[in-house]
């Protein structure tokens, strides 16, 4: 979404606009969709673990207004107490233009150079989201998106794994759970959902429909 207002407008409609229908045909979207399985496969080999590609959308039990779409989920990992743990793995293709928003030298893993040390935990740093994202070397948008997925799986950390379009190199960033940011996201989502519910008509049909053209 380009803005919160765009999100609210979409959630208050029960049809798809022409622009929304055309999103899937855009080259950048198709590229990401078609290369995603390759990136998942490569990261699975690196991790030595299966990376699942969920096909369903999930809703949080305690906060039903929060939904999750997972690009990838790392399987067969365990916490220190022996409990089973899923780890979110956000998957992206980065265009030549988008490369400027990433710092590969801060990646926990790069295909040509291998592994680096896991980064420090920045949750308690007295800085904003943009600064925290910069400490990891990733865009702020994907920092918050990954935190939401970490929240959805109740995970202690997550990965942002990308392929650079320029050289097809895989980079993966290890990102710790940031409960302060997660709390902010929950509050913002709650406020936004209240606006949506107040704007929707009483008989709103939750089923998304394609708008028909009668002209």
Residue ranges and their predicted role:
Residues 1-215:
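Accessory terminal regions of nucleic-acid processing enzymes
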């Amino acid at each position: 979404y380009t803005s919160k207002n765009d999100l609210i407008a979409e959630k208050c409609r029960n049809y798809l606009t022409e622009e929304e229908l055309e999103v899937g045909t855009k080259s950048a979207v198709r590229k990401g969709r078609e290369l995603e399985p390759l990136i998942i496969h490569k990261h699975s080999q690196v991790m030595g673990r299966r990376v699942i590609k969920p096909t369903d959308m999930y809703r949080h039990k305690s906060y039903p207004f929060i939904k999750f779409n997972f690009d990838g989920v790392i399987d067969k990992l365990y916490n220190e107490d022996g409990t089973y743990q899923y780890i979110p793995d956000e998957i992206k293709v980065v265009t030549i233009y988008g490369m400027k928003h990433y710092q590969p030298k801060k990646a926990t893993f790069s295909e040509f150079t291998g592994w680096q040390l896991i980064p420090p935990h920045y949750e308690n740093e007295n800085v904003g989201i943009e600064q925290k994202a910069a400490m990891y070397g990733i865009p702020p948008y994907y920092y918050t998106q990954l935190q939401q997925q970490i929240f959805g799986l109740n995970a202690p950390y997550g990965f942002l794994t990308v392929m650079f379009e320029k050289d097809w190199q895989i980079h993966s960033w290890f990102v710790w759970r940031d409960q302060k940011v997660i709390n902010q996201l929950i509050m913002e989502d709650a406020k936004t959902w209240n606006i949506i519910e107040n704007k929707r008509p009483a008989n709103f049909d939750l089923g998304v429909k394609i708008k028909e053209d009668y002209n």
